[in-house]
Amino acid sequence: MRPILMKGHERPLTFLRYNREGDLLFSCAKDHTPTLWFADNGERLGTYRGHNGAVWCCDVSRDSSRLITGSADQTAKLWDVKSGKELFTFKFNAPTRSVDFAVGDRLAVITTDHFVDRTAAIHVKRIAEDPEEQDAESVLVLHCPDGKKRINRAVWGPLNQTIVSGGEDKVIRIWDAETGKLLKQSDEEVGHKKDITSLCKAADDSHFLTGSLDKTAKLWDMRTLTLLKTYTTVVPVNAVSLSPLLNHVVLGGGQDASAVTTTDHRAGKFEAKFYDKILQEEIGGVKGHFGPINALAFNPDGKSFSSGGEDGYVRLHHFDSDYFNIKI
């Protein structure tokens, strides 16, 4: 399995997202310019220029016409995917951490960090069909009990009825997307012991996977918030992804830059590790990055995956045929 090495960013990667068809890959990094690639051969198609801060997250609409990005420059932006034109800017008074389109693309959930006197918040915005009619009003604003803790990820639940969030306070919360009422939150006993860094939904929205600095990833039932599985690894987990094809999960991570030694690379600490989703056992690893892995994404067809690292590279891996026959 020879990776395709994609160099388009000057700074560490933060997020990767495929479109629904799996032919396009969007990457975000700390260098202000989200980038679009062909997901098949890694060819760079273009960049989206307009942010002046690290871009933490992005999402693409179902028909691949719109892109939404969230940045440390205190804005979230809507873009025309094809032309690269900036369609609208949502301005906040705090860095924007996470963005996610609802099913149907008429709503988006955006999280903002704690900043000066502003508490961390989850905002629901209406997305107009015609960019000319777009406004910045929030339909709903949610706050976690500890407003100083960052909300690293918020995504839509099944049928846009709920919003699932997780972050620095280690708690996963499920909110009613209409009323803003807190419906469920993860139990301290079974939940993560350190910051939740990443969250990835299954293709059918029935369950989701969270990654944490406590060196585990956990699989949860989307409706009941029951803990289903726990995957334990040797490094803090920065990124997680679920295979849409096989019962596999992939985890990526590594020490924070300040704690890294050159031996970590040789010790296999910067591998993307694959686990059997059901048996919770490690089935393999993919090396390559010279530093922690910050972003992971499976192609929607399940036949390839990409990883983004602190080293500024995106590595695109098309699986060999023997991957599909792994037996434990």
Curated annotation (Swiss-Prot):
Question: How is this protein annotated for GO cellular component?
Answer: Cul4-RING E3 ubiquitin ligase complex; eukaryotic 43S preinitiation complex; eukaryotic 48S preinitiation complex; eukaryotic translation initiation factor 3 complex
The keyword Repeat appears for this protein:
yes
Per the record, the major location class is: cytoplasm
**Could you tell me which residues the WD repeats occupy?**
8-49, 50-89, 146-185, 191-230, 288-327
| GO terms for MF | translation initiation factor activity
The protein's UniProt keywords, in alphabetical order, are:
Cytoplasm, Initiation factor, Protein biosynthesis, Repeat, WD repeat
Please list the GO biological process terms of this entry: formation of cytoplasmic translation initiation complex
Report the subcellular localization: Cytoplasm
What InterPro entries does this protein map onto? Answer: eIF3i, G-protein_beta_WD-40_rep, WD40/YVTN_repeat-like_dom_sf, WD40_repeat_CS, WD40_repeat_dom_sf, WD40_rpt
Entry-linked Gene3D superfamilies = YVTN repeat-like/Quinoprotein amine dehydrogenase
Q: What does this protein do?
A: Component of the eukaryotic translation initiation factor 3 (eIF-3) complex, which is involved in protein synthesis of a specialized repertoire of mRNAs and, together with other initiation factors, stimulates binding of mRNA and methionyl-tRNAi to the 40S ribosome. The eIF-3 complex specifically targets and initiates translation of a subset of mRNAs involved in cell proliferation.
- Self-association or partners: how does it assemble? Component of the eukaryotic translation initiation factor 3 (eIF-3) complex.
Q: Which family does it belong to?
A: Belongs to the eIF-3 subunit I family.
In Swiss-Prot or TrEMBL terms, this protein is called: Eukaryotic translation initiation factor 3 subunit I
Species assigned in the record: Arabidopsis thaliana
